[in-house]
Amino acid sequence: MCATVLGGIHPDTGRPYTIVEPQLGGWGGHAINDGSTAVFSGFHGMTFNCPVEINEARNGLFVERLELNPDPGGEGRQRGGKGIRADYRIRAAGGFLTCFYTRSKFPPWGLAGGLDGSPNYVEIRRADGTVERHAEMTNFGLKQ
């Protein structure tokens, strides 16, 4: 289970915004096929991803990257599916981040000789170049 809640004040409109985003993940491979890539689990219900252009306009942030996870993981005779990588850049100070990611310390395990999947995490990249990696945080203050 991976969930991200990101919010703040829109720099152009002054209105508060909140993004509640279950993360797309991959499913394990099986006997005859690779695993599915970038899918929501049944626990997410009728949830859809928001197009980048709408996300940027509504929420006053930049989506720097939205792609399949480029990290290695899940390789085997039938490869496990890939999750996503989403990079956001906030445009105004005073934002917050809450997240909870499972499989951060112990990645999804490989079966029948397949390799383990990649771990789940959030990276905070500061303007000074420092990087912090987290799997759980609540109301973490974000600076521009």
Set out the residue ranges of the language-model regions.
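Glycine/proline-enriched, intrinsically flexible loops and inter-domain linkers
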Residues: 1-144
